[in-house]
Each structure stands twice: as structure tokens, then as C-alpha cells.
Amino acid sequence: MASSVLNLFKSCRPFTPIRFSSLPKSQFRIQFPLRPGKETQLRRCFTTLSSLTDGGAPISGGKELWLHNTMSRKKELFKPKVEGKVGMYVCGVTAYDLSHIGHARVYVTFDVLLRYLKHLGYEVSYVRNFTDVDDKIIARAKELEEDPISLSRRFCEEFNRDMEQLQCLDPSVQPRVSDHIPQIIDLIKQILDNGYAYKVDGDIYFSVDKFPTYGKLSGRKLEDNRAGERVAVDTRKKHPADFALWKAAKEGEPFWESPWGRGRPGWHIECSAMSAAYLGYSFDIHGGGMDLVFPHHENEIAQSCAACDSSNISYWIHNGFVTVDSEKMSKSLGNFFTIRQVIDLYHPLALRLFLMGTHYRSPINYSDFLLESASERIFYIYQTLHDCESALGEKDSTFENGSVPSDTLTSINTFRTEFVASMSDDLLTPVTLAAMSEPLKTINDLIHTRKGKKQARREESLKALETTIRDVLTILGLMPTSYSEVLEQLKEKALKRAGLKEEDVLQRVQERTDARKNKEYERSDAIRKDLAKVGIALMDSPEGTTWRPAIPLALQEPVTTTP
């Protein structure tokens, strides 16, 4: 099974002393509704599982990781510049409003990469900045009659709350532009001294025609490029694509003193300065959304190389867009949903699963159906693990390798192999999530085993399977603090989406029970269907009727159109 999956998806120093120590090509799209963290947890993951193969030998895979490099336009074997250490910079948000789920996709993507690198044993210096000096921030501050820096700091805090909800690990450092003006000025000085920039009336522009390889990341030719700014083309520029490194102060805008007079940094120079400050000019991974390839990352490369000719980033990694009706979700288009809006109705871990259900480089279309599918799937996962926990009771979760039945070991090893194969192949999270179905099914089968040989060694199997899945969930950032708590939260969200309270559901359950006793089967079926339409599924058992969240029948029914 693992082989079929593989076949199918087959030296300058920084200018400021605050740095950290530091498969073959294929393209495809995966998107489908799936059915059924802590640092110490990440270090612990798979320490037990590595000995679960015949003879105690760990499953092959090691530290091999293939990542798609935007620069080379192909998958490459990951090799860090310094053995055992990884430097990673991801462009952060421009903080002037609540973040939308397009932002969530970026940072969940790189959180998965961060977690997997840690799982592989790397020491990761992860830098994710905040842009708190920008035209959009200034405009929003004027609109709200608020100080721009104060407004931005407020939304930086809101962003961090969103990331905590999505179980994204904290970066090693989160630098803000306003705290790094001296470093930015130093970098601009270096670029000017090296002859790659020019001054115009207090502004400093980068001269793109002085940089022969400009466009190598995006594949654009210089003559085809538009200005690399967020404002209209300035006729004072030598070339239309020249972009601002420093902007002269305007009345009512924040400014800082510089050798060129009062002003503020341009957009692109900020990330070049902060990445060099913490990671140096040469590091491993630079990431962000696909929309940053041009002009932002293209301009970063030009600036950094102009300041230091040995500047080099090994891997440029970009995630695909979240779309709404095939258009990119963005604040500027006004077609966005904030993270807060989504997690008001759906559990944050359901949103995380939704984002991981499509390969990170492919576009993902926002829809209620896919979010409902993710919510149903995550409920199934946690319910299965909760039932497993209940079946084991207070028993010690540790187990001896030799006590686990061979068929369980086979199931675990198959899943482990699929996990390594899919994650090492450019982070194929959809394949990993799909592969989880088999061990979950095995747990459910074992829980309902009451006699025979399986019952005799049931506990050892359940312990081993639960440990396996728990460790994978931890690496994926999907492990909750408590199965029971998150199940209750998922039910609360489902009730909110349905516009019901639990007592309403329980009353309908009782009405249905009475109808069945009276052999009013049509009424009984109608009650079940009414609840199913709004995402409440009823489950009958000898102990009575219970309910769980499900994809609303109204979303599952095909839409009919009249000619």
C-alpha cells in the first residue's frame, strides 16, 4: 500500500549582532473531504514506534525530506547549510486588521513544516516578522483616528491569539519593523555604497537594471515587470520597476531620522533586514504565500544580494491560495472570512484539518461543505481515541514490544511507512490524513471485540495503536489537550451552526423515541431527517439514542436546476 502511495504522488555576517546560532519532479492536486503540541511531545514522538518493526529496527526514512523549491521549480532533497540546524524565515502579516483564513493557511503550512523538521531532529531557528510600518496601516489608523504603531501592535496581539487557537507553535522570534529601523538603515547604506540604489528628494530607490538576475525567482523579464511597490509608478524613477527602500516623511505619518532625512522604510527592505539580522544573509528556508513571489520575494533577493554578494537562501517555499468562487481570498478584494469568523462556528482544529486536507501548494476552495467535512472527520478521530481511552480505563498506556500482536504491528508499520513516505515527499498531509483511516478502523473493531483471540490481546493492541495515532497527531499539530473536552466543543459548535440548544435536540430525541414506541415510524423518520438536515446525526444503540455532529443533509443533497 505504501509503495502505491509513492507511485501515485511520486558568508557575509549580518550587520547587527542579534543572530541565532544557527523524488522525482511531479505536480498534482489533492483535495477531498476526509471521513473517517508540545515541544516535549514532539521530541518523544515515535521513540516507541521506532522499535515496533521485526527485530526492533526502525522503519526506513531517516531525515530524508523533499521540498518543492520555487527557485528551481522542482522538488529537491533538503540539505541544511549547517548539519542538524535549520534557519527558516516566513513573511508575517501586515497588521492592520484581523487575519483571514488565507493567512491561516500560510502559517499552518509552515507550522507543519516546522513540526516535521523538529520531528526529524533538527534544531530550528524560525523567524516570522510583523510588518507594523506600511501604507495600509497608516490609512487604517487615519480611518480609526488611532496611532499607527499602537493600532498595529493591537492587531499583532490578535494575530498571536489566532495562531494559538490553531495550535501553531511560537516562532523563535517575531521581530517588528518598528523595532529594527537601525538595521534597515544600515542595510540601505550598504546597498547605496555598493551602487545598487539612488536618492531622489529624500527617497531611496533600488535600481533594478543594476541587478542582472532580477526576475529569476518569478520567471519575469525585467521589461515585463511593473513597479514593485504598493503605490502608483513614480516618474522620478530611472526604471518603472525600481522600488522604494526608503520613503521621505509625509505630514501626519510616522517617521524616523536617517542620513537622508526623516522617513520610513519601504515594504520589501524590511524583511531583508530582519532575516539578515537573525539568520544572516545565508540560510535555509524562506517562505510565504504564492502572492509574495513577485514583487516581494523577488525584491528581497535583489536587495540582499546587493548588500552582500554571497547572500543565498537554499529553498524558497510558497503555499497556494485560499479561493472563494475561484478568486483568491484577500482583504483588498473584500471576499475574505476572518479566522475569528470561521472559528466562531467551527472548531479551530477543524479549520486546521480543513487547511491540511489539500496539499499546501494547491489552491483550496473555501466552502461550508469542506469545513463541515473536516469537522465531521475530526470528531470521528477524537471520538475513536476517546473510546479507546475509555476502553483502557486507568491502565498504564505503556506496552512491551513483544506483547503487541503481529497483525497490529503490521497495521502500525504500514501507517508509519505511509506517514514517512507522504510527509517526506513535500509534506503530503492529505495522504497522511487518509492513511490514518485504517488504524482508526482497527481501534473501533477492537473496541467492539468481546471474545476470541483478539480479545485476549486487545489491550496491548489498543495501547500501541492509540500511541501511534497520538504521536502523528502531535507532529501534525492536531493533538488536543483532552479528547473529551474537544468533543464537547465540537458538539457546541455544531449546535450553534444548527441554531439549536442541546435541550432542543434531546427533546426531539425523546419525541422520536415516543413515536417509535407508538409505531409512528413516518414521524420518527421525519424527526431524524429534520435533525440531519442541520447537521445533527442520531445514533441508536441498546443503551439508547445519542447524537453527534455530521455534514448537514442540506449540503449533501444535489442541487437541481430547472432548464
Curated annotation (Swiss-Prot):
EC identifiers of the protein: 6.1.1.16
Residues where Zn(2+) binds: C91, C271, H296, E300
Location in the cell: Plastid, Chloroplast; Mitochondrion
UniProt-listed CDD domains: CysRS_core
Catalytic activity entry: tRNA(Cys) + L-cysteine + ATP = L-cysteinyl-tRNA(Cys) + AMP + diphosphate
Gene Ontology MF terms: ATP binding; cysteine-tRNA ligase activity; metal ion binding
The keyword RNA-binding belongs to this UniProt entry's keyword annotation: no
Cofactor remark from the record: Binds 1 zinc ion per subunit.
Name of protein: Cysteine--tRNA ligase, chloroplastic/mitochondrial
Organism annotation: Arabidopsis thaliana
